[in-house]
Amino acid sequence: IPVAISKDFSHRSETSSLLTDVASSITSLKIAKNNIKQWMRPSKRKVSPSILGLLGAKLRVEYQPLGTIGLISPWNFPVVLTFGPLGSIFAAGNRVMIKPSEFTPRTSELMKNMFEDNFSEEEVAVITGGPEVGADFSSLPFDHLLFTGATSIGKHVMRAASDNLVPVTLELGGKSPVIVSDTSNIEQSS
């Protein structure tokens, strides 16, 4: 994974990728694994009006999968922002379709191969491609759609999903500050 990320970024420290993408992904998946029984346990609620409780009524919430979740992940932390949400998605019993960033083609292809080797396409499907694929992906009738990325793109995602009344979770950013030293290639940096 760090090698693919480094190639996509023209060089990113292996240590940085291991800490930010790999270790953080493992932590998210472990949290889901360790808490799934508690998360899925039925939740008791108070009966209202309380007179119904006196008559023997009981109330509880039973959690059920939503169905198919769409996940659009960004270029800057391509692994953790793909694998991070997966723990919760799977813990809730859902399937997932993933659209990774076209700006990290090697990492996206590696993740696609990893999922294809370990899951059926009915459980996890990875769709790669550019902006047109992303626009088509956003307009699919998911049961929920997660997007992490720039605010300007998030507006398009929200608009496309609204045609199918798909609930959307947006994690919007848009700034990735860097330090450019006087020994840097200014043309390449800009």
Segments (PLM) and residue ranges:
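Generic secondary-structure signature for well-ordered alpha-helical cores
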Residues: 10, 34, 38, 116-121, ...
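Hydrophobic packing residues within well-ordered alpha-helices of enzyme cores
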Residues: 5, 108-111, 137, 157
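N-terminal Rossmann-like NAD(P)+-binding subdomain of aldehyde/semialdehyde dehydrogenases
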Residues: 1-59
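Conserved small-residue-rich beta-alpha loop and adjacent elements
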Residues: 48-118, 165, 187
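Residue-level signature of the cytosolic catalytic core of signaling kinases
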Residues: 18-21, 62, 129, 182
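Conserved NAD(P)+-binding/catalytic subdomain of aldehyde/semialdehyde dehydrogenases
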Residues: 68, 118-190
